[in-house]
Amino acid sequence: MDNLVDIDEDGTQEKLSVNSTPYQTQECVLYGSIFAKNVPDLERRLAGLCDPGCEEFFEHEMSFSLRSSGIMDIKTDIKLRRRFRTEHRIQNYWQLKYIGVPEPDQKCPTIVRKEISSLVHSQDMMTYAKSLGLRMDYEYMTQGKLWTKGNIKILHSILTSTSRAGTYDSNSIKSVSDSALVEISISLPESAEYMPAAKSLRDFADQLMPLVNMEKVDYWKKMFPAQAAPRR
């Protein structure tokens, strides 16, 4: 979905479809959640606010971290994502997405972070990830819909996980929650001024209330715990 090259392994497309967004960008993003039973209400709201039509997706995502040794334990987030197929073979094309540390701008109404996306082909992705020094933190599957409003992307999805690592049959996949995750974002050139886009994203998010309260989630505070004061 994000800066992906749409590659058809079955050979049914005549040419590749390439997203024109540069691979290295900055991203403004907000997160929210809604009970799964209320998703139809959200979809009706989005149908009235967004561009015509939406796109369904079913994806497998793994989150890896790369920790640097030193005085502080710095954690770098790497996301691996691929289309998830239940009836056909799983694709070996992955989106490799680096997510940078959010900007420490308390006045900005959204999360702002650097991201780098690229496409990787591998029949043994775990071996490739380990060769990069990455360690998997968790994995999950997402199934939902993508909407757009100009350059704003809106995703809502149900998250599921497998009870046995590496096994993805219907008996092993279980729902994570009775709620759906909602994410809205804007991608900008790496050096662009982000505040106008962030305010525009916040204004759009406010139109989803009271169905969804989109928030600037301080997830990085858990990623980077405060250091203990040195002993004297």
From Swiss-Prot:
InterPro entries (UniProt xref): Mediator_Med18
Keywords in alphabetical order: Activator, Developmental protein, Nucleus, Transcription, Transcription regulation
Assigned GO CC terms: core mediator complex; mediator complex
Pfam family, one: Med18
GO molecular function terms attached to this record: transcription coregulator activity
Domain of life: Eukaryota
Location of the protein in the cell: Nucleus
GO biological process terms, semicolon-separated: positive regulation of transcription initiation by RNA polymerase II
Chain's role: Component of the Mediator complex, a coactivator involved in the regulated transcription of nearly all RNA polymerase II-dependent genes. Mediator functions as a bridge to convey information from gene-specific regulatory proteins to the basal RNA polymerase II transcription machinery. Mediator is recruited to promoters by direct interactions with regulatory proteins and serves as a scaffold for the assembly of a functional preinitiation complex with RNA polymerase II and the general transcription factors.
Subunit structure: Component of the Mediator complex.
Similarity-based family: Belongs to the Mediator complex subunit 18 family.
Protein name as annotated: Mediator of RNA polymerase II transcription subunit 18
Organism: Caenorhabditis elegans
